């Protein structure tokens, strides 16, 4: 499994700095290498809005890291233009942080170590590491309506709308199956469950739909081939 203290240096000067500020649930959302949204919104005053910053369109959040290798911009990007700019509520951002930190980082690490890198390569410094490409993450209600207008059939109760799901791009069937195996192994080794793991295909294009909720996960596994 991935030793997260090893890549903590990408965001904090030392592991001890991680304990300096626990102001709110956004301590893990990095505005820059050494500053988090939690640090810059902390306050001793109790208010109904919890001094929470508004989350804007994805293009402005490419530098906001949900985890070392995934940004808020990546997980809110969409080709549909809407009035809300596919802006996630704060609860959805928290779910995205959990998804990236507990699942996607592990998947990225294990796939590269098992199938891409040589034994002598260092995952944290090698230029041969393959990125994990997200086709879609959070989906707002307005984006869902746009998808329906386009002739698609998105679910109104989809995990995407809570920030609990991602669609992961796959180079083909073999890579998709390897991703599935790794995610199942992560679940078994960590003794934590996911909600949905679907290998999907449309024509010759493959992707993996993966969802993990804060609770009430159903461990649904399926193949949806069209």
Spans of features found by a protein language model:
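Generic secondary-structure microfeatures
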Residues: 111, 136-138, 151, 170-172
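Extracytoplasmic cell-surface/polysaccharide-interacting catalytic and binding patches
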Residues: 1-128, 214, 219-226
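Catalytic cores and adjacent binding grooves of peptidoglycan-active enzymes
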Residues: 157-166, 170-226
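Polar/charged alpha-helical tracts
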Residues: 6, 10, 112, 127, ...
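Charged, often glycine-rich, active-site loop that binds/positions anionic groups
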Residues: 141-158
């Amino acid at each position: 499994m991935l030793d997260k203290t090893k890549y903590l240096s990408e965001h904090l000067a030392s592991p001890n700095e991680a304990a300096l500020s626990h102001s709110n649930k956004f301590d893990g959302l990095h505005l820059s290498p050494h500053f988090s949204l939690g640090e810059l919104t902390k306050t001793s005053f109790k208010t109904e809005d919890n001094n929470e910053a508004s989350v804007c369109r994805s293009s402005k959040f490419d530098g906001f890291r949900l985890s070392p290798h995934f940004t808020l911009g990546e997980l809110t990007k969409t080709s549909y233009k809407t009035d809300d700019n596919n802006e996630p509520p704060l609860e959805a951002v928290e779910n995205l942080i959990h998804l990236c930190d507990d699942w996607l980082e592990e998947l990225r690490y294990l796939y590269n170590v098992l199938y891409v890198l040589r034994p002598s390569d260092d995952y944290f410094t090698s230029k041969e590491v393959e990125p994990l490409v997200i086709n879609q993450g959070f989906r707002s209600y307005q984006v869902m309506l746009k998808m329906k207008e386009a002739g698609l059939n998105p679910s109104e109760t989809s995990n995407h709308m809570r920030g609990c799901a991602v669609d992961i791009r796959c180079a083909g069937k073999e890579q998709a199956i390897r991703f599935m195996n790794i995610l199942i192994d992560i679940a078994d080794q960590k003794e934590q469950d996911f909600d949905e793991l679907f290998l999907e295909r449309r024509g010759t294009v493959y992707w993996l739909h993966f969802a993990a909720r804060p609770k009430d996960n159903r461990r649904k596994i399926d193949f949806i081939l069209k």
